[in-house]
Curated annotation (Swiss-Prot):
Subcellular location: Cell membrane
Cellular component GO terms, alphabetical: plasma membrane
Family annotation (Pfam families): MFS_2
Gene source species: Xenopus tropicalis
Protein name as annotated: Sphingosine-1-phosphate transporter MFSD2B
GO MF annotation: an example: symporter activity
Membrane-crossing segments per the record: 108-128, 136-156, 236-256, 280-300, 323-343, 357-377, 379-399, 415-435, 462-482
CDD domains recorded: MFS_MFSD2B
Catalytic reactions of this protein: sphing-4-enine 1-phosphate(in) = sphing-4-enine 1-phosphate(out); sphinganine 1-phosphate(in) = sphinganine 1-phosphate(out); sphinga-4E,14Z-dienine-1-phosphate(in) = sphinga-4E,14Z-dienine-1-phosphate(out)
Family, similarity comment: Belongs to the major facilitator superfamily.
Role summary: Lipid transporter that specifically mediates export of sphingosine-1-phosphate in red blood cells and platelets. Sphingosine-1-phosphate is a signaling sphingolipid and its export from red blood cells into in the plasma is required for red blood cell morphology. Sphingosine-1-phosphate export from platelets is required for platelet aggregation and thrombus formation. In addition to export, also able to mediate S1P import.
Recorded topology in the membrane: Multi-pass membrane protein
Keyword Lipoprotein tagged: no
PANTHER family in alphabetical order: MAJOR FACILITATOR SUPERFAMILY DOMAIN-CONTAINING PROTEIN, SPHINGOSINE-1-PHOSPHATE TRANSPORTER MFSD2B
Amino acid sequence: MAETSRELPLSTLTASTRRALRIRARQAREAKLSVLSKVCYAIGGAPNQVSGSASAFFLQIYLLDVALISPYQASLVLSLGKTWGGITDPIVGYCISKSKWTRIGRLMPWMLGCTPFLVVSYFLLWFVPTFETGRVLWYLAFFSCFQALSTAYHVPYTTLTMFLSTDQMERDSATAYRMTVEVLGTLIGAAVQGQIVASAHTGSHCNVTNMTGNLTADFLYEPTEYITSARQVYMIAAGIIGCLYLLCISVLFLGVKERDDPYALVAGKVIPFFKGFRETMQFGPYLNLISSFLLISAAVQIQQSNFVLFCTHAADLQDHFQNLVLTILIAAVLSIPFWQWFLQKFGKKMAAFGISLMIPFSIMLVTISSLVVAYVVAVASGLSIAASLLLPWSMLPDVVDNFRLTNPQGKGLEAIFYSSFVFFTKLSAGIALGISTLSLQFADYNTSLCKQSYSVVLTLKLLIGAAPALMIIIGLTILAFYPITEDTRKETELALDVIRMRTRRSTLIVI
């Protein structure tokens, strides 16, 4: 039987047989997903993006100005928490691979089970305990818990793509819906959180004597009323986002049905985790996809994390950076349907090269200091970011299907593929942020100065222009050797449909 499973070279079939197989495969394929199901699936990914955006923009300033812990302690909380979040990705993938199929699926119980604890940990992350000694341990514990539980939600959610439908086009469409809502969630997280906590960061409680960093004692003094109010608005924002988690997981559970995929000829035979991890990391298309998008994701992360600093210290755009950030995110949201149409029309590899739009416009922003140019660059960056977000999650199911075809005897590796991809993405983002911050340290960045030195300005220009451009070029060069084309993708889809038909037929005969 194992030998039969590998005898699937479609080139040996006659044209009439191939047409017959296509008709039979199309009839055997699962019903297409409704728009409502795709929307419900997409909504399930929104809260993680909202909370991630809120914490990315405001957690550091909250720890320093509201929780009143030292910068060293804040860096400890952020770095260790993110590292722990990355470590939990393969752990969650391993646990999911060992999970049994239940009445509501294999992935849905994970999301339902972790959501209440995720909400509690997120809320307590934005709560200031009464004790001061050891307060850093409070935030380290709950930020680590939040990162781990967020992973326990995100890994099964992204893996769910493989169990929505056996039709690759439907999965791609669901991914486009998901990425649209997730980018919209990022926009909402940055905008809504900013509006709620804006009063916590006004300058009315500070008295700055000059622009050289010499501050009066009044600037260092934090009135009790201000601190109390600031802590309250942050808790209100955390409560709203926590309620959003509960609402979205309810929509996901009620609107999406997880479907098992009978692609394996030996039903229920699961490859052990470490063996499966070794096999996935030796799979050529997966390594190619990871290598290319690690560089591309790191490039996007470097540019995003240094954009506000660049606007403030290197481009004289400090009064416009918030609007520029919103422009980037809005452009990304609006362009995702375009990229979905483009990849269906011209192929995913061709669409991936749309990421290169970021290169000339970023260089233009560095060399031409103009508000109009900055907004043009923001729109172009939004287009590129949308492509970089959509394409890896659209291409990853194709890699998994290709692996299924060449390894039809085992099941349960989908979570390993997805968790490993998320792990390496987080790892690359962490390394990129560490290197960019370290480069600013070498350039003698001084937090007490309103006007930085020329070396800092030059470093920021390199971090916004040259460094991301080089990484994107290398990443796209690697992606050019990605072996899965549109033709091979369709051949794989047909071959898997044949396996599914045989599996269903053998099951009916046994029954």
